[in-house]
């Protein structure tokens, strides 16, 4: 929600926000943008009379042991008939519409892979917009609009795509709102036991995301994940590029900090960087495969990761 507020501010809106508590680094970023933050969810905030309330999924209709609403501001919004929407819906309508969206989904590695992909596109001169669930050091902000030109071929937005539900009034996963042309399915394990009964329930949500990718789009899928194989088995209508496994379209040979990127056994590039761990090696392959879909050569992507 902090990144969304930053995007709205960059777009020229006056933005205020509230939460139970706001902490660095996001609080510092929002303060620097001139976004006023209020603690708590009191009804006195109705006096601001905004054009629109954007509701985060932390908000609910639940009540305290005393019987009082836990989120009195939300109750006042509903009683007054004030306009409201969810964060993902606002993004879809005001930021993502008409853009080539590159979405990064998965149980793990979303923030890292989204940051890598955005940086690759930046290094390639594509000036992407992005929304990341953290503050990447190489950008210094969690979100920006990027180059926006209606109908322009280079009009990209990279977004961290979460499978958690959208809002108390919209129980679909957030990522179904984003309608990506390029979607990374990084991995898939059981998570969010508060809203999902089992792994198949999450797999169904991931397949909902797959359904939104157009025929000329691309799915970048971890070939090591049986759960993602099951997701695609439910139906797939787009080009698929796999990564990770030896027989994948994109694989790696070497140590995680110094490895060759292969396509069907043929060397395409070499990545030398300070990051370690096989997980980051896989994240890099995913970002490289996604960037290729928008015309970034693998060698250029590898150079960007090294920087």
Walk through the language-model features, giving the residues of each.
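Short linear motifs in intrinsically disordered
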Residues: 19, 135, 142-144, 244-254
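Adenine nucleotide phosphate-binding catalytic loops in nucleotide-utilizing enzymes
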Residues: 56, 190, 196-207, 217-218, ...
């Amino acid at each position: 929600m902090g990144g969304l507020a930053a995007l709205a501010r960059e777009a020229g809106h006056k933005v205020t926000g509230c939460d139970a508590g706001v902490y660095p680094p996001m609080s510092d970023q929002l303060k620097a943008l001139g976004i006023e933050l209020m603690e708590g969810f009191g009804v006195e905030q109705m006096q601001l009379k905004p054009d629109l309330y954007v509701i985060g999924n932390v908000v609910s209709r639940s009540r305290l042991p005393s019987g009082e609403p836990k989120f009195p501001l939300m109750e006042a919004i509903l009683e007054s008939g004030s306009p409201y929407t969810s964060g993902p819906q606002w993004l879809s309508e005001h930021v993502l519409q008409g853009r080539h969206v590159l979405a990064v989904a998965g149980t793990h590695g979303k923030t890292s892979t989204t940051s890598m992909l955005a940086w690759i596109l930046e290094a390639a001169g594509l000036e992407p917009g992005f929304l990341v669930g953290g503050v990447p050091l190489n950008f210094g902000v969690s979100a920006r609009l990027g180059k926006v030109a209606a109908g322009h071929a280079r009009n990209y937005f990279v977004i961290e795509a979460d499978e958690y539900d959208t809002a108390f009034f919209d129980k679909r996963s957030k990522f179904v709102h984003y309608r990506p042309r390029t979607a990374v399915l990084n991995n898939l394990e059981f998570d969010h036991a508060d809203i999902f009964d089992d792994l198949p329930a999450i797999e169904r949500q991931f397949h909902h995301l797959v359904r939104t990718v157009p025929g000329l789009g691309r799915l970048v899928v971890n070939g090591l994940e049986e759960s993602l194989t099951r997701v695609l088995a439910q139906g797939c209508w787009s080009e698929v590029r796999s990564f990770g496994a030896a027989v994948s379209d994109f694989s790696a040979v070497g140590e995680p900090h110094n490895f060759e990127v292969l396509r069907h056994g043929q060397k395409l590039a070499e990545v030398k960087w300070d990051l370690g761990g096989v997980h980051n090696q896989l994240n890099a392959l995913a970002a490289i495969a996604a960037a290729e879909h928008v015309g970034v050569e693998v060698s250029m992507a590898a150079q960007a990761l090294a920087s």
